[in-house]
């Protein structure tokens, strides 16, 4: 009954207005009040500040500064095996598996469409037909910077407008087409082994999605899909190394990765509800890709 009420509130709440309000509040410099809120948040969600570059809550002038805190150097060693794809974020595995008939598994009884997820680009979706996907949920306690799972050259960024449902396990199990209806930023990278998609999905009170090359992508929001194309070579090419930061959430959300057919094989530890740490092994390149 309580779960039904929570889901009902998701549909009734003015989520965009609430998110804008929370984003503004999280950017306020309120001195001791900000510090008190940060301390409460740390205690409430059991945030491990020993890993932070600056573990002192009073050092953060706004809640957003705290939320996108950097980690100490060496806190997340990057697996340097060229045949290993590394985790892009501290998170929890929501779902993973094959892309079947252009659809990705969301939760029991729910699937969502790869083409819709990618902003309705059929040609782009074709690149991932019969491929593999993983959905990673970043909880409030997690480190909220997102990194590259392998070396890649940015080909395209797509902003897709949408709703702002919460993306926690309860809503994933109860809101149809959740990840393809929420606002999101799709990043397509070309790698030595094929293209990959890294999709940053917005949610209720996610005040901002940013990338290292474009800064804040949202807000502002808009009614239209927007696309940016990037050169593959030359001084304007955006080339990011494995483990390098590529984006961040100001208040957390979800990362979805898409891989082409036969490119990767997820490591054995990759299972739903399994915690992940950025830089640790995520998937192995398929044996045919290694040759």
Curated annotation (Swiss-Prot):
Reply yes or no: does the keyword Lipid biosynthesis apply. yes
Catalytic activity of the protein: a 1,2-diacyl-sn-glycero-3-phospho-L-serine + H(+) = a 1,2-diacyl-sn-glycero-3-phosphoethanolamine + CO2
UniProt PTM: Is synthesized initially as an inactive proenzyme. Formation of the active enzyme involves a self-maturation process in which the active site pyruvoyl group is generated from an internal serine residue via an autocatalytic post-translational modification. Two non-identical subunits are generated from the proenzyme in this reaction, and the pyruvate is formed at the N-terminus of the alpha chain, which is derived from the carboxyl end of the proenzyme.
Q: Which GO terms describe its cellular component?
A: plasma membrane
- Primary location group: membrane
Positions of post-translational Pyruvic acid (Ser) modification: 253
For this protein, what does the record note about how its cofactor is bound?
Binds 1 pyruvoyl group covalently per subunit.
One of its GO biological process terms is:
phosphatidylethanolamine biosynthetic process
Site positions (Cleavage (non-hydrolytic)) are 252-253
The protein's topology relative to the membrane is: Peripheral membrane protein
Q: In which pathway does it act?
A: Phospholipid metabolism; phosphatidylethanolamine biosynthesis; phosphatidylethanolamine from CDP-diacylglycerol: step 2/2
Q: What keyword terms does UniProt attach to this protein?
A: Cell membrane, Decarboxylase, Lipid biosynthesis, Lipid metabolism, Lyase, Membrane, Phospholipid biosynthesis, Phospholipid metabolism, Pyruvate, Zymogen
Q: Name one GO molecular function term.
A: phosphatidylserine decarboxylase activity
The record's annotation in InterPro entries points to:
PS_Dcarbxylase, PSD-B, PSD_type1_pro
Q: List required co-factors.
A: pyruvate
Q: Outline the subunit composition.
A: Heterodimer of a large membrane-associated beta subunit and a small pyruvoyl-containing alpha subunit.
Q: What does this protein do?
A: Catalyzes the formation of phosphatidylethanolamine (PtdEtn) from phosphatidylserine (PtdSer).
Matching HAMAP family:
PS_decarb_PSD_B_type1
What is the protein name for this chain?
Phosphatidylserine decarboxylase proenzyme
Origin organism of this chain? Photobacterium profundum (strain SS9)
């Amino acid at each position: 009954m309580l779960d039904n009420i929570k889901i009902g509130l998701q549909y009734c709440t003015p989520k965009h207005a609430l998110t804008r309000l929370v984003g503004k509040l999280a950017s306020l410099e309120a001195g001791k009040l900000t510090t008190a809120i940060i301390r409460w948040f740390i205690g409430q969600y059991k945030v491990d500040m020993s890993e932070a570059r600056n573990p002192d809550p009073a050092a953060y002038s706004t809640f957003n500064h705290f939320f996108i805190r950097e980690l100490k150097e060496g806190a997340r060693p990057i697996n340097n095996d060229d045949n290993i794809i590394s985790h892009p974020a501290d998170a929890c595995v929501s779902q993973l598996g094959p892309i079947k008939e252009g659809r990705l598994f969301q939760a029991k009884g729910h699937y969502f469409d790869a083409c819709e997820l990618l902003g309705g680009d059929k040609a782009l979706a074709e690149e991932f037909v019969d491929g593999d996907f993983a959905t990673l949920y970043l909880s409030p306690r997690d480190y909220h910077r997102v990194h590259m799972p392998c070396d890649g050259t940015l080909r395209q960024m797509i902003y897709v407008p949408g709703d702002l449902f919460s993306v926690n396990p309860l809503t994933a199990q109860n809101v149809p087409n959740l990840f393809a209806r929420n606002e999101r930023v799709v990043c397509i990278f070309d790698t030595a082994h094929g293209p990959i998609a890294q999709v940053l999905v917005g949610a209720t009170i996610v005040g901002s999605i940013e990338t290292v090359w474009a800064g804040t992508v949202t807000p502002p929001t808009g009614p239209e899909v927007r696309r940016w194309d990037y050169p593959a070579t030359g001084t304007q090419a955006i080339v990011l190394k494995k483990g390098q930061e590529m984006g961040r959430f100001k208040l957390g959300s979800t990362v979805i990765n898409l891989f082409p057919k036969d490119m990767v094989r997820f490591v054995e530890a990759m299972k739903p509800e399994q915690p992940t740490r950025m830089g640790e092994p995520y998937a192995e390149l398929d044996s045919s890709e290694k040759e």
